[in-house]
UniProtKB/Swiss-Prot annotation:
Gene (UniProt): Myt1
Biased composition annotated in UniProt, kind: Low complexity: 143-157, 703-725
Protein name: Myelin transcription factor 1
Entry-linked PROSITE patterns: ZF_CCHHC
Residues where Zn(2+) 7 binds: C948, C953, H966, C972
SUPFAM superfamilies to which the protein is assigned, alphabetical: CCHHC domain
InterPro entries: Myelin_TF, Znf_C2H2C, Znf_C2H2C_sf
Molecular functions per Gene Ontology: cis-regulatory region sequence-specific DNA binding; DNA-binding transcription activator activity, RNA polymerase II-specific; RNA polymerase II transcription regulatory region sequence-specific DNA binding; zinc ion binding
Biased segments, Basic residues type: 41-50
Species of origin: Mus musculus
Residues the entry annotates as binding Zn(2+) 6: C895, C900, H913, C919
GO CC terms: nucleus
Length: 1127
């Protein structure tokens, strides 16, 4: 957010607190003087509580901007400038003030809201009254040597905490006295840097309605600039002290009205700007964490600040109205000359913004709870060193702050001096030196992420994994380490119902519905405090209520840095008695049901020490080292709940004294939001009942007061129905995110010792028959006698954990349960994590032939171990034989719970488990047995056959897979609608029903079957022997065939060689006998070669021819011709 928008919000809040005195708690008109409520941005309202939507206020702002253009830079947020000037001692004039204002970071929304209370508390501080600037008071720095920090004694520190706590009650009286004193004094000449500003403002009129902010700047010898605010009367130009004294009572009522207006105005602005506050607070938390790590580097700087702190008041020529005196010294003739030896102006915290401080008080160490970067490293030692350093700073300031002679002047109306140690501590936490920002190493914990594209805003970094677009790159170890600490600091809040619903966790109280309920409850109590007697202040009491730091004591390892034998300053045994006076909380649900929460309600928080006007507004870091160690341990474990909650927090009797209102909380801090109150549950467990906190539930007692909110309440009570008066809607759970079938089959967490069940549909029908008058939900509910019941961690550790690494169960699609059984519905489970989990379990393959695990009903993971949910198993209808593991140990792969097939187990997608822990069916039956008044024991039924409880059903045709039997009505085709609605007794559900075969009942048939099996085995062995013999014969014949084939190949090769040789001989013969002609034949050639050779053969074989003298010469010639041919 820009500095302009931040400046606008800050100025409008401060001006709202300085409204007219007539706007008391009953008069709800516009706080802008002269505004009738018309022309507002929110046109549907006839009034408003904020100046943001007032057109008259905007018009006056524009007029003021024209007159203040010379000092526009100096008019950034007054509190921020005052805090920054108080923390950094490096400014020496108005130029430094302007540089500071430009360099102020707008990331710290939390300290800004906390500082606004201090601004509103400075109602008694100085304002220039006339243009001349004459002063009646001269502060003397040289005449009072006791104003140095070395003048304080150690005895002042013992009563300083109690004085601070009790002095906050009289801020209205201080404001009244400051208004009386304001008219009797004027301001002397200021330094030349601001004279022009004061003259311009005096020209515009000293009776400005919006309370201008002025800078009182010390001369060059004092390096401190303080911006203060002043209350101005709405009456034109007050002229005498008598006029102001006549309006003292009305002024005091006006201050109280403004305080109440500030609270409700802040609630409106929180609803409008929650997203911006979340972003700003995350940046602020990062700064605070890094600055506390660098506290040792700034120790020198803080010592210089403490030495220069008493010189905050301005130089010799600069005077103003002093308010360091106690309330008795404000009156009478001392108005014109208060004692000037008090030379330190500090910021006073007012009750007006006590709701912001009470939120940080609930978590006991809100400043330290932001340091989750060190939490992930487990750096407990560094936290304790930081806390010890703060304790030393507080002691050093308190021991050397003020002389004992001035302790007598400290009254209940002077929180100024005693708030100085808090100021010094605050300096070390909220210092905003721009040079420190460059030293930080702020980057996204996601590997490879540079901070761009985050959901949480445009700033280039973040310190949490929520909102990171590259969340799929995060290893499961880092994800689990970060997500486990990102929890809401409000005790009992799981992060649900927050305005920023895109994140399942948050680190601040803004947007938390439980914190909003506490704030509204506190406003009701303030109305009671206005009408009642103010509590007496005890300035001498050294016992003040510290914020309760609830730590798991048994889990804290013994550290050498703390003393286990030293008790804290305020014993926890007596804390309940002290809180007993202030713990009565009364709310009217009709006044805030739809405006605060919309359509969803969570249980309101228990009011503890923040409701007390005596509550100390800051954590005491210096009581002992043991509390420091407890605080550090609580910081490292943000999931710490109220383990040491006192059981009696109120003395008001309950409407139903026979029942104790219990809030059932498991170890994750999830409340039981069910509206169901069952008779049998009350009889079985008389000490347990559900805490009804739905504002949408109306009773006839308050129906006339809720006529204006009936429409939003009816839509909140049941989004599925527009009738809020239906009887069956009284007992429905608040969660309607699941359909009715899903809610019936949801694996519910159950335990006989402490029950936190959401009512099912079967419960609704039976409970709807109860008498309407027995259950009363009064409009004003007083939360008393709370007993927080935590479920056994040994049993719930396996039952209530999400398999996704780093998931605490919040934000699931399945509803408001603290856990779930599968990755489906988990917002943290993405494809990368599922693939990673599937890769680590490579043996998890679907037993269906040809199934690769895709298309399963149980999820999109790549494998499963059972046929249920497999689409291919249903199509084929085959019953697959058990795997090798099942054959080796069939008992190992079966769930001992009757009727359980291994689905939905926490241990994963396995088809079996060895115990009932993690079995959703066992949890469901345990709940049914508890509701029916009978106990459930799965071990006694380990060997029973699973059968369908529907009468006449043999298990066939079920919709939940290929199994023959089942133990629930879901998926049974023979179960009618009435049968589903009706309840079965525990005996009927758990009764053994064996269906034995007729074959197994006759021993003769068994023997006959065994004989047939033996005969078949013998015949099989004979056939196997014949088969072996045939196989041997076939192998020999194959060998002979191969030999014959080899011989044929050799013969073919020889034939080819002979053919080639014959061809050569024929060609040689043709060439030799080409010139020789036989009688009656043509010359030899390839065509007549065969005939020619036959003729020659006949001639040589025939002796007659051969001896014939005619043929003898021819034959000799032929011999000579063929003699050269070699064969």
């Amino acid at each position: 957010m820009s500095s302009e928008s931040d400046d606008k919000r800050a100025r409008t809040r401060s001006k709202t607190l300085r409204g007219p005195p007539e706007t008391t708690g009953a008069d709800l008109s516009c706080p802008t003087p002269g505004c009738t409520g018309s022309g507002h941005v929110r046109g549907k309202y006839s009034r408003h509580r904020s100046l943001q939507s007032c057109p008259l206020a905007k018009k006056r702002k524009l007029e003021d901007a024209e007159t203040e253009h010379l000092v526009s830079k100096r008019k950034s947020h007054p509190l921020r400038l005052a805090l920054d000037e108080g923390y950094r001692m490096d400014s020496d004039g108005s130029e430094d003030a302007e540089v500071k204002d430009v360099s102020v970071s707008d990331e710290s929304e939390g300290p800004l809201e906390e500082a606004e209370a201090e601004m509103s508390g400075q109602e008694e501080i100085h304002h220039p009254q006339t243009a001349e600037g004459k002063s009646l008071i001269k502060p003397h720095f040289d005449s009072n040597p006791t104003s140095s920090p070395s003048g304080f004694s150690k005895s002042s520190y013992s009563s300083y905490q109690g004085i601070i706590a009790t002095s906050l009650l009289n801020l209205g009286q201080i404001a009244e006295e400051a208004l009386v004193k304001e008219d009797s004094v004027s301001v002397a000449k200021l330094s030349p840097t601001v004279v022009h500003q004061l003259q311009d403002e005096a020209a515009m009129g000293v009776n400005s309605d919006e309370g201008e902010k002025d800078l009182f700047i010390q001369p060059e010898d004092v390096e401190e600039v303080i911006e203060v605010t002043s209350e101005r009367s709405q009456e034109p130009c007050p002229q005498s002290l008598k006029d102001m004294v006549s309006e003292e009572s009305s002024k005091q009522k006006g201050v109280l009205g403004h305080e109440e207006e500030g609270e409700e105005e802040e609630e409106d602005e929180e609803e409008e700007d929650e997203e911006e506050e979340e972003e700003g607070e995350e940046g602020e938390e990062e700064e605070e964490e890094e600055e506390e790590e660098e506290e040792e580097e700034d120790e020198e700087e803080e010592e210089e600040e403490e030495e220069a702190a008493p010189n905050v008041i301005f130089g010799e020529d600069t005077s103003h109205t002093s308010v360091q005196k106690a309330s008795p010294e404000f009156r009478g003739p001392e108005l014109s000359s208060p004692k000037p030896e008090y030379s330190v102006i500090v910021e006073v915290r007012s009750d007006d913004d006590k709701d912001e401080d009470s939120r940080s008080q609930k978590s006991a160490v809100t400043d330290e709870s932001e340091m989750y970067d060190m939490m992930t490293r487990g750096n407990l030692g560094l936290l304790e060193q930081a806390i010890a350093l703060k304790a030393e700073q507080v002691r050093a300031v308190c021991e050397s702050g003020c002389p004992p002679a001035e302790q007598g002047h400290l009254g209940p109306g002077e929180p100024g001096k005693m708030a100085k140690p808090l100021d010094v501590v605050r300096k070390s936490c909220y210092s905003k030196d721009p040079s420190r920002v460059e030293k930080r190493e702020i980057k996204c914990p996601t590997p490879g992420c540079d901070g761009t594209g985050h959901v949480t805003g445009l700033y280039p970094h973040h310190r949490s994994l929520s909102g990171c677009p590259h969340k799929d790159r995060i290893p499961p170890e880092i994800l689990a380490m970060h997500e486990n600490v990102l929890k809401c600091p409000t005790p009992g809040c799981t992060g649900q119902g927050h305005v920023n619903s895109n994140r399942n966790t948050h680190r601040s109280l803004s947007g938390c519905p439980i914190a909003a309920a506490e704030k509204l409850a506190k406003s009701h109590e303030k109305q009671q405090l206005q009408t009642g007697d103010p509590p007496k202040n005890n300035s001498n009491s050294d016992r003040i209520l510290r914020p309760m730091c609830f730590v798991k004591q048994l889990e804290v390892p013994p550290y050498g840095s703390y003393r286990p034998n030293v008790a804290p300053a305020t014993p926890r045994a007596n804390l309940a008695k002290e809180l007993e006076k202030f713990s009565k909380v009364t709310f009217d649900y009709a006044s805030f049901d739809a405006q605060v929460f919309g359509k969803r309600m969570l249980a309101p928080k228990i009011q503890t020490s923040e409701t007390s006007p005596k509550a100390f507004q800051c954590f005491d870091y210096s009581h002992d080292a043991e509390a420091a160690h407890m605080a550090a341990t609580a910081i490292l474990n943000l999931s710490t709940r109220c383990w040491e909650m006192p059981e009696n927090l109120s003395t008001k009797p309950q409407d139903l004294p026979s029942k104790a209102v219990d809030i059932e909380v498991d170890e994750n801090g999830t409340l039981d939001l069910s509206m169901h109150k069952h008779r049998k549950r009350e009889n079985t467990f008389p000490s347990s009942s559900s805490c009804s906190s739905s504002p949408g539930v109306k009773s006839p007692d308050v129906s006339q007061r809720q006529s204006s909110t009936s429409a939003p309440s009816s839509s909140m009570t049941s989004p599925q129905s527009s009738q809020a008066s239906r009887q069956d809607e009284w007992d429905r759970p608040l969660d309607y995110t699941k359909p009715s079938r899903l809610r019936e089959e949801e694996p519910e967490e159950s335990e006989p010792a402490a029950h936190s069940f959401a009512s099912s549909e079967a419960d609704d029908q039976e409970v709807s028959e109860e008498n309407f008058e027995e259950r009363k939900y009064p409009g004003e509910v007083t939360l008393t006698n709370f007993k927080l019941k935590f479920l056994s961690k040994d049993i719930k550790k396996e039952l209530l954990t999400c398999p996704t690494p780093g998931c605490d169960g919040s934000g699931h699609i399945t509803g408001n349960y603290a856990s779930h059984r599968s990755l489906s519905g988990c917002p943290l489970a993405d494809k990368s994590l599922r693939n990673l989990m599937a890769a680590h379990s490579a043996d998890l393959k679907c037993p269906t032939p040809g199934c690769d695990g895709s298309g399963h009903i149980t999820g999109n993971y790549a494998s499963h171990r059972s046929l249920s949910g497999c689409p291919r198993a249903k199509k084929s209808g085959l019953k697959v034989a058990p795997t090798k593991d099942d054959k080796e140990d069939p008992e190992l792969m079966k769930c001992p719970v009757p009727g359980c097939v291994g689905l939905g187990h926490i241990s994963g997608k396995y088809a079996s488990h060895r115990s009932a822990s993690g079995c959703p069916l066992a949890a469901r039956r345990q709940k049914e047995g508890a509701l029916n008044g009978s106990s459930f024991s799965w071990k006694s039924l380990k060997n029973e056959g699973p059968t369908c409880p529907t009468p006449g059903c043999d298990g066939s045709g079920h919709a939940n897979g290929s199994f023959l039997t089942h133990r629930s009505l879901s998926g049974c085709p023979r179960a009618t609608f009435a049968g589903k609605k009706g309840k079965l007794s525990g005996d009927e559900i758990l009764s053994p029903k064996f269906k034995t075969s007729d074959v197994l009942e006759n021993d003769e048939e068994i023997k006959q079957l065994n004989q047939e099996i033996r005969d078949l085995n013998e015949s099989n062995s004979e056939m196997e022997a014949a088969m072996v013999q045939l196989q041997s014969q076939i192998s020999s014949m194959e060998k002979n065939l191969k030999n014959i084939e080899e011989e044929n190949k050799l013969i073919e090769e020889q034939n080819e060689a002979l053919f080639l040789e014959l061809s050569g001989l024929s060609q040689a013969l043709i060439q030799s006998l080409a010139n020789i002609r036989l009688p009656h034949m043509e010359p030899i050639c390839e065509q007549n070669f065969d005939a020619y050779v036959n003729t020659l053969t006949d001639m040589y074989s025939n002796q007659d021819c051969y001896q014939n003298p005619e043929n003898k010469g021819l034959l000799e010639t032929i011999k000579q011709a063929v003699r050269g041919i070699q064969v």
